[in-house]
A protein has these predicted regions:
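Active-site-proximal cofactor/substrate-binding loop regions of enzyme domains
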Residues: 1-17
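Short, acidic, small-residue-rich periplasmic hinge/interaction motif at the N-terminus
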Residues: 12, 19-23, 29
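Tryptophan-centered motif/residue detector
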Residues: 17-19, 42
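C-terminal catalytic domain of Rieske-type non-heme iron oxygenases
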Residues: 24-279
Length: 279
């Protein structure tokens, strides 16, 4: 009998995740594990979605970029006022499906009107941890103080096509625990997100160049270079759609992303979608 594909799916953090591919379960990249989710001493905002009109890889790179705060976010840097401002070296650690980093920033104090009297009152070192998991999960963990004042943010970025992305945003914190603070904190997060969007929507080229020699990467871009190298390794494994071939055939052929059952069963109605192959 003729068959159509179906895919493994599950719910986590209030988000439905579906694995689109034919890998067996023990070889897949699972959804990132948020260790503090539902843990004592932590509070999660309601998950929100953000639709952006640019490529998901560009979006992830922007979130990883340790240099952009000084130029894009007025509350995160000094807006060029410090002539000796510099980006400190990034400490990068490999993971099974990506990389983590640790970064020390020279950062201004937090706004007491927004974050209250417990917010840090002086400029100085601020530690940010983060990284990426798989091709499209961004992790940002901001520690404004040693034991508290922590914001942990997780962005699950769903590619719609080359030029559109839907982001599912999970925001965790271990301070300002009153439910009444949820709206204020998310409003602040969305202001920051739209500062990024205003810059990124005009970035050219829309899609990350195939070669890193086609854009200037500086020492501060080390984690971005690492992310691009990881994506290249995924491409070699056949994890990425060949968009050019797909577009050439889109009016003549309907394709399906292969499901796990294709490895053991036959008689599929639709051809498998074209994938990039190693050079």
């Amino acid at each position: 009998r003729a068959k159509v594909d179906s895919y493994p799916a599950y719910e986590k953090y209030g988000i439905v995740f579906a694995f689109l591919g034919d890998l067996p379960e023990n070889e897949r990249c699972d959804a990132y594990e948020i260790e503090e989710f539902e843990a004592d001493g932590w509070r999660a905002n309601e998950v929100i979605t953000i639709d952006i009109d640019y490529n998901y890889e560009r979006s992830v790179e922007n979130g990883l970029d340790p240099a952009h705060n000084e130029f894009v976010h007025p509350t995160h840097g000094f807006e060029g006022a410090k002539n000796d401002y510099k980006v400190n070296p990034t400490q990068i650690t490999d993971t099974a499906w990506g990389a983590n980093f640790a970064q020390v920033f020279d950062a201004p104090p937090l706004d007491a009107d927004t974050y209250g009297e417990s917010a840090r009152k002086e400029s100085g070192n601020l530690t940010v941890y983060g990284g990426y998991h798989g091709p499209n999960t961004l992790i940002t963990q901001i520690h404004t103080q040693k034991e508290t004042g922590w914001f942990h943010q997780y962005f699950f970025e769903q590619p719609i096509d080359e030029f559109q992305t839907r982001i599912y945003f999970v925001n965790m914190r271990n301070w300002l625990m009153d439910e009444a603070m949820d709206e204020t904190i998310m409003e602040r997060n969305l202001i920051i997100a739209h500062q990024d969007i205003d810059v990124m929507k005009n970035l050219r080229p829309f899609v990350t160049p195939a070669s890193m020699t086609k854009e200037i990467l500086l020492p501060a871009d080390a984690i971005i270079g690492k992310y691009r190298s990881t994506l290249k390794e995924f491409d070699k494994k056949g994890f990425k759609i060949d968009v050019r071939t797909l577009k050439n055939q889109e009016h003549h052929t309907a394709y399906a992303i292969p499901s796990p059952a294709r490895r053991t069963e036959k008689n599929w109605v639709l051809d498998p979608i074209p994938l990039l192959t190693p050079d």
